[in-house]
């Protein structure tokens, strides 16, 4: 699965999302639950803003010295007997993983949840050479069983599905006959996955954070599946975006605390594992360890106005407060990275041809910026995207550009402005009934197709104000 989801146009995806009342109910319920948990967890910590500032400082420092820390990480992993591969593109990353699988004659592969492996289309690449790839994260496994449905959330992939829908998928695809309770369904999947773990020739994980000075990677899960992915198969491949770094364990401690509280509202998730190449005296762990460090456009973001987006720790706090995501769901974004973070990141990694609409899918309420634990100014970056799209890319709709040009001319000419402010209310009120415009024309049509527009006042404010002044004199 690549970054791009489906081939439908943006407006069509939005329309489908708005009409899917079941999905909207599931998303709304999950957002409210995660929001309350995050508030509670952050309040327990105390001085939350100070922790956010510290998280921002760590991420900014790491990005400012990223080349040094990447070199240190590579040296640390190699010194411990691991293998490091720097992939400039997603094709290079997938090809390397294919090469390792073929070299090790791996046919059965288990993996934990990883957005970057989705980004590089790793599953498809491995399936092309005859490998069976099984998702071990429960949410990802549900989607894989459901005809490879794409994820709609970066932390909870199946957030858009109800338990009734999940039970139906298991019944149709796996012959499941038990109840729709989470306990029964989880127990059913656990039994299947245990066999897959024991049969696996190779395990693949993502990487929440890599620790430069130790050559370790940190994996954060609620299910413990990543531990089994790294411990049972003889070969472990970890795939990370090049920015997912911390200098030392001290910084890791801070960011893991911020991640867990912001993602699921817990002090710590159930399983936090720090792994890497197996030591000579260690009993557990893989015989061979590979770390694939993926660029895929990230280096092009460094040193630009959009660099702060690389501070992201993939907690999804911004998604969990976004009113647009709440109403249209994750699939409407057409990217594996949905929500505010996706609206900023997707155009940078995937290009404006596919994602030019996303920066406009925002009310600019800045709730995302307030929620971000590392203080990424998401709403400001969305505005910057809009500026680039209109001024540098020249991609704004022609009708919109013409309208803004005409408005600029009118607003800068007092006579034309006076005439416009008198004429516009007269024209709009001709379309009104009982103070509401229900059938607009031109630029008003898209609005009135789905909601009424209050008719403007027949009297301009400046005229009313002048009358008021005269009455008071």
Curated annotation (Swiss-Prot):
Q: Which GO molecular function entries does the Swiss-Prot or TrEMBL record give? A: 4 iron, 4 sulfur cluster binding; metal ion binding
Q: Which residues bind [4Fe-4S] cluster 1?
A: 312, 315, 318, 372
Q: Tell me which Gene3D superfamilies the record gives.
A: Alpha-helical ferredoxin, NagB/RpiA/CoA transferase-like
Query: What are the 4Fe-4S ferredoxin-type domain coordinates in residue numbering?
Result: 303-333, 352-381
Binding residues for [4Fe-4S] cluster 2:
322, 365, 368
What InterPro entries does its record include? 4Fe4S_Fe-S-bd, 4Fe4S_Fe_S_CS, FTHF_cligase-like_sf, Helical_ferredxn, LUD_dom, LutB, LutB/LldF, LutB_C
List keywords of the entry alphabetically.
4Fe-4S, Electron transport, Iron, Iron-sulfur, Metal-binding, Repeat, Transport
Listed under GO biological process in this entry are: lactate metabolic process
Report the function annotation for this chain: Is involved in L-lactate degradation and allows cells to grow with lactate as the sole carbon source. Has probably a role as an electron transporter during oxidation of L-lactate.
Family under the similarity heading: Belongs to the LutB/YkgF family.
What name does the UniProt record give this protein? Lactate utilization protein B
